[in-house]
Curated annotation (Swiss-Prot):
The gene is atpH. This is ATP synthase subunit delta. The lineage of its organism: Bacteria, Thermotogati, Thermotogota, Thermotogae, Thermotogales. InterPro entries: ATP_synth_OSCP/delta_N_sf, ATPase_OSCP/dsu. One of its GO terms (cellular component) is proton-transporting ATP synthase complex. It comes from Thermosipho melanesiensis (strain DSM 12029 / CIP 104789 / BI429). F-type ATPases have 2 components, F(1) - the catalytic core - and F(0) - the membrane proton channel. F(1) has five subunits: alpha(3), beta(3), gamma(1), delta(1), epsilon(1). F(0) has three main subunits: a(1), b(2) and c(10-14). The alpha and beta chains form an alternating ring which encloses part of the gamma chain. F(1) is attached to F(0) by a central stalk formed by the gamma and epsilon chains, while a peripheral stalk is formed by the delta and b chains.
Length: 179
């Protein structure tokens, strides 16, 4: 997904403030929830007849005490500038940008079936040793792998899946036949 300049400006501003008040993760969760609320009640939030203060109050009521003044101000700014259609993009981009700001690394792990907590911990420790950063693992299931995993991080791909090994063997056999 390509993120707009508008989204990145809002994300960078919220990250800067979040870092100062040590709430980067909290704001990420709030943005995710805001995105869910926005998508569910899009017609209400996009209605120009509804005043900004009413939209913000609705969000404050739905979030209860979990929302702080900084985040309320952020939401107000988004609605005042009529940028609410960017909320899903802002939420998605914030997630990835916050990983970088916190000096973590995104790790995509594709497996044939869901990994156990021990397997995830082993992958996490392996990645941490390789790049000396805390990994944030995103799991994806692809039954065509048969077994094993494909691990991607820092532009590297480690394929320890059965289908990957079978493909490698097939390439070697075909190269022998041609040679």
């Amino acid at each position: 997904m390509r993120y707009s300049t508008i989204s990145s400006k809002y994300v960078n501003a919220l990250l800067m403030v979040g870092k100062k008040v040590n709430k980067i993760e909290d704001y990420g969760e709030l943005l995710k929830a805001l995105c869910d609320v926005y998508v569910q009640f899009k017609d209400f939030f996009d209605n120009p007849a509804v005043k900004v203060w009413k939209k913000v109050e609705t969000i404050k009521e739905s979030f209860g005490t979990s929302i702080d003044k900084v985040f309320v101000n952020f939401v107000s700014l988004v609605f005042e500038n009529k940028r609410q259609k960017f909320i899903p993009q802002i939420a998605a981009y914030y997630r990835y940008a916050s990983i970088d700001v916190e000096n973590k690394i995104l790790v995509n792990v594709t497996t044939a079936e869901k990994l156990s907590s021990e397997e995830l911990r082993a992958i996490s420790e392996f990645v941490k040793k390789c790049v000396n950063r805390v990994p944030v693992i995103e799991e994806k299931i692809d039954e065509s792998l048969i077994a094993g995993a494909v691990i991607e991080f820092s532009g590297k791909m480690i394929d320890v899946s059965v289908s990957g090994r079978l493909n490698k063997i097939a390439r070697e056999v075909f190269s022998l036949r041609k040679g």
